[in-house]
Amino acid sequence: ELRLPEIARPVPEVLPARLPLPALPRNKMAKNQ
């Protein structure tokens, strides 16, 4: 059971890794404004 919470942590870490990709275009648009 202790291993379950440990596996749940790496999952959220992978999601944020994909967020930076869409966040880049937003930062570029902000600079254009």
Curated annotation (Swiss-Prot):
Coarse class of the protein's main subcellular location: secreted
As annotated in Swiss-Prot or TrEMBL, what is the tissue specificity of this protein? Expressed by the skin glands.
Q: Give the record's GO CC terms.
A: extracellular region
Which species is the source of this protein? Rhinophrynus dorsalis (Mexican burrowing toad)
Q: What is the effect of changing residue 13 to R?
A: In [E1R,E6R,E13R]RP-27; loss of stimulation of insulin release and increase of IL-10 and TNF-alpha production effect on mouse peritoneal cells, and no change on IL-1beta production effect
- Tell me the keywords, alphabetical order: Amphibian defense peptide, Pharmaceutical, Secreted
Q: What taxonomic classification does the UniProt entry list for its organism?
A: Eukaryota, Metazoa, Chordata, Craniata, Vertebrata
Oxidoreductase in keyword set = no
Q: Where in the cell is it found?
A: Secreted
Q: What is this protein called?
A: Rhinophrynin-33
What's the domain of life for this entry? Eukaryota
